[in-house]
């Protein structure tokens, strides 16, 4: 009876010692859980990863404790990475123990049903110098490979990392400092990420605002009026006076047709038409049976104005809506008959302004120069479009002819029949 009680007491003491060792090992073993990830074996074997044969453990804690107590991987290597397979049942090996020489030697990839744990206590640190921010050694140990501020791989794997163990913060605070320091590290990481996102957002908004400003500045500069037309197009309201600047004879009239196609959502420019009145001061230019077409293309509006001169015996009369211009010459590439407009010096006392430009003078040279690149770039595009359409048409025609010829050749080819064919045909005829 005494020996039986002594044996049971010894057995109880052994169990208590074993449980104490396991509890102490699990408490001193600092770990980081990574859910639904597994080691990329193909790329890790060439980087020095080592492992033992898989063993069976009933729970994840047993597998973690086994990794913490294993010091003989490939001789004298300590386990610092373990994977627990939750899909294995019926006492199948589900605990995999590995030794990683450094963080880069063990890249991970997503895998459902697998729990990976890094043993941070014995895991060698890897310090990186980033161009945007520099993290201390404690921060690199804290975040490991899956931190967004330490390694580029973190950006791809942070979606799979879900830390489940909270008890490691106390141990880490005992090793690296107080909990306040850890909170500062966490806040610094989050603040830096938010600052980068805010800077990126602000940069996009500033670039958009600058582009809007450029478009707004281009609006008054690129709007050009045609000096050889009667219709005046301007972003400001123009008022017609009872006595226009240029007066036409009663037997001649000019009908301008202006078509504005704004590319942006802007207000349509007003058009002021000058009517004919009895001439008081003859200030006009005489065109001899000529028709000219001017195209003014701007970034904000496309103004196409076509004017024709009536076939009168005295010729057509055209007016210029400017007051003080001595000599004006239009040279455009699209006009077949270049027209030179010459005017005599006009005294301001004998004229009234028809349109008020408010400090803006239209430049015909700029409109002609602006239309040249459009034509230069527009013609090759249309040319290549026509060539491509022609090639596709020819290709489809050739394919159709080939298929048609094949069908015709097969229909005209005489089929050779064997004796069996004749026998079968005779049987069908008899039936």
UniProtKB/Swiss-Prot annotation:
It is a single-pass type I membrane protein. It is found in: Membrane. PROSITE patterns: MANSC (PS50986). Residues 248-261 have a biased composition (Polar residues). Glycans are attached at residues 72, 222, 251, 327, 352. Widely expressed. The chain crosses the membrane at residues 386-408. GO terms for cellular component: Golgi apparatus; membrane. Residues 234-277, 352-372 are annotated as: Disordered. Residues 27-385 are extracellular. Keywords: Glycoprotein, Membrane, Signal, Transmembrane, Transmembrane helix. Residues 33-117 form the MANSC domain. Residues 409-431 are cytoplasmic. Residues 262-277 have a biased composition (Low complexity). Residues 1-26 form the signal peptide. This is MANSC domain-containing protein 1. It comes from Homo sapiens. The gene is MANSC1.
């Amino acid at each position: 009876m005494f020996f039986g009680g002594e044996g049971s007491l010894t057995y109880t003491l052994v169990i208590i010692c074993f449980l104490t060792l396991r509890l102490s090992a699990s408490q001193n073993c600092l770990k980081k859980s990574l859910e639904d990830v597994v080691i990329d074996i193909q790329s890790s074997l060439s980087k020095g990863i080592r492992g033992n044969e898989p063993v069976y453990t009933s729970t994840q804690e047993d597998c973690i404790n086994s990794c913490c107590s294993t010091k003989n991987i490939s001789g004298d290597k300590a386990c610092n990475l373990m994977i627990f397979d939750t899909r294995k049942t019926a006492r199948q090996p589900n605990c995999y123990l590995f030794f990683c020489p450094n963080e880069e030697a063990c890249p991970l990839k997503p895998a459902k049903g697998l729990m990976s744990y890094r043993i941070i206590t014995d895991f060698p640190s890897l310090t990186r110098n980033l161009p945007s921010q520099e993290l201390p050694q404690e921060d690199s140990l804290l975040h490991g490979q899956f931190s967004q501020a330490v390694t580029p791989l973190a950006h791809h794997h942070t979606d799979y990392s879900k830390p489940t163990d909270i008890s490691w913060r106390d141990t880490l605070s005992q090793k690296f400092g107080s909990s306040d320091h850890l909170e500062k590290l966490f806040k610094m990481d989050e603040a830096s990420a938010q600052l980068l996102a805010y800077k990126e957002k602000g940069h996009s908004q500033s670039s958009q605002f600058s582009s809007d400003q450029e478009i707004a500045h281009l609006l008054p500069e690129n709007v050009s009026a045609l000096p050889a037309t009667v219709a005046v197009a301007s972003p400001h309201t123009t008022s017609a006076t009872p006595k226009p600047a240029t007066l036409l004879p009663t037997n001649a009239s000019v009908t301008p047709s202006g078509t504005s196609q704004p590319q942006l959502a802007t207000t349509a420019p007003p058009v002021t038409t000058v009517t004919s009145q009895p001439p008081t001061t003859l200030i006009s230019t005489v065109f001899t049976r000529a028709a000219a077409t001017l195209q003014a293309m701007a970034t904000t509006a496309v103004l196409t104005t076509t004017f024709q001169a009536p076939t009168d015996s005295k010729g057509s009369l055209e007016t210029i809506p400017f007051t003080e211009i001595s000599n004006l010459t239009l040279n455009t590439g699209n006009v077949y008959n270049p027209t030179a407009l010459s005017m005599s010096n006009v005294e301001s006392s004998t004229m009234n302004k028809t349109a008020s430009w408010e400090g803006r003078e239209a430049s015909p040279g700029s409109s002609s120069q602006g239309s040249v690149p459009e034509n230069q770039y527009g013609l090759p595009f249309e040319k290549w479009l026509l060539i491509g359409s022609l090639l596709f048409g020819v290709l489809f025609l050739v394919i159709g002819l080939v298929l048609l010829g094949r069908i015709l050749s097969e229909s005209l080819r005489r089929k050779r029949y064997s004796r069996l064919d004749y026998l079968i045909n005779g049987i069908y005829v008899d039936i």
